[in-house]
Amino acid sequence: MPIDCKAKCGNRASLKRPKTGDALCKDCFFAAFEAEIHHTITTSKLFRRGEKVAVAASGGKDSTVLAHVLKLLNERHNYGLDLVLLSIDEGITGYRDDSLETVKQNRDDYQMPLKILSYEELYGWTMDRIVAQIGRSNNCTFCGVFRRQALDRGAKLLGVDSIATGHNADDIAETVLMNILRGDTARLRRCTDIRTGGGEDSIPRVKPLKYSYEKEIVMYAHYKKLVYFSTECVFAPNAYRGHARAFLKDLEKVRPSVIMDIIYSGEQLRFKDTVKKPVRGNCERCGFVSSQQPCKACVLLEGLNRGLPKLGIGKKSKGDRMIAKQNQELALRERANLVKNDF
């Protein structure tokens, strides 16, 4: 039996919102979805008039919907923003090369300038080459660290005031769970923040989709007929996040509100004064923001270049021992060569 739209617009309902359970027509769903993002942007004061904002674009559903909605709201509510697309090419054959074609389509559809930066030009490595050297057990560590810094590098190059990322409510709830399971209080402290970074030497990142459900983002993209890339990264099945995602989906079956419950719980967390806070500064090598010296990206890159790919994996003391061992071996070889030359 047909159901009337709960917004009482006179139309028949064509969908049920996963977030609220409301039966709505497509137009009322669009209006509600866009209004919630506008509310998030304005109440959290994510942008200021005249700012230049880079939309982190991957070609996936989240970044495509983010670019579409930001352009729409910018024009509808006169935010006065200068929007550009920033995309990172990790060098994953059969995945990123295809998704970049979608990003270029986004550029044309939304009339936004596009800047693409690659791991190859920034670090001299592609993810395909990195995985060939390290295997698939820690590849997401390398990719995540390099990608975060690559976005910072691209944002600095473009001269933007902030980076808007497509992190949605599901992503944030998953991250809260991951940090709890790992006992990572430093990341748990800031993972629900809608704005991170900022300050004298770093460009802030904002999450306009923080309270938007992944299912609703998919529905919005589907009914709006947006062009996006839906293939999963070929290296993703081995990611730790996948376990948190599966656990969250199981919880959602018995408690539909669990995503927002976890986010709200994360926002209300308070830590004892005795909990050590990471001190953020600038890397002594590359100059980008880091809470360690040298930064994680530089440590991982050094390991790759020295043939010690696991150098930055695990505790710092382990990496120090690996470097010391390699230096000792080099010294012994040099000494052996000197003795050989004397004869």
UniProtKB/Swiss-Prot annotation:
Pfam families membership: ATP_bind_3 (PF01171), zn-ribbon_14 (PF16503)
GO MF annotations in UniProt: nucleotidyltransferase activity; tRNA binding
Pathway: tRNA modification; 5-methoxycarbonylmethyl-2-thiouridine-tRNA biosynthesis
Localization per Swiss-Prot or TrEMBL: Cytoplasm
PROSITE patterns: UPF0021
GO aspect biological process, one term: tRNA wobble uridine modification
Primary location recorded for the protein, binned into one broad class: cytoplasm
EC number, UniProt record: 2.7.7.-
GO cellular component, one term: cytosolic tRNA wobble base thiouridylase complex
CDD domains assigned to the protein according to its UniProt record, in alphabetical order: CTU1-like (cd01713)
Signal sequence, start to end: none
Keywords, comma-separated and alphabetical: Cytoplasm, RNA-binding, Transferase, tRNA processing, tRNA-binding
Biological function: Plays a central role in 2-thiolation of mcm(5)S(2)U at tRNA wobble positions of tRNA(Lys), tRNA(Glu) and tRNA(Gln). Directly binds tRNAs and probably acts by catalyzing adenylation of tRNAs, an intermediate required for 2-thiolation. It is unclear whether it acts as a sulfurtransferase that transfers sulfur from thiocarboxylated URM1 onto the uridine of tRNAs at wobble position.
UniProt family annotation: Belongs to the TtcA family. CTU1/NCS6/ATPBD3 subfamily.
Stated name of the protein: Cytoplasmic tRNA 2-thiolation protein 1
Taxonomic lineage of the native organism: Eukaryota, Metazoa, Ecdysozoa, Arthropoda, Hexapoda
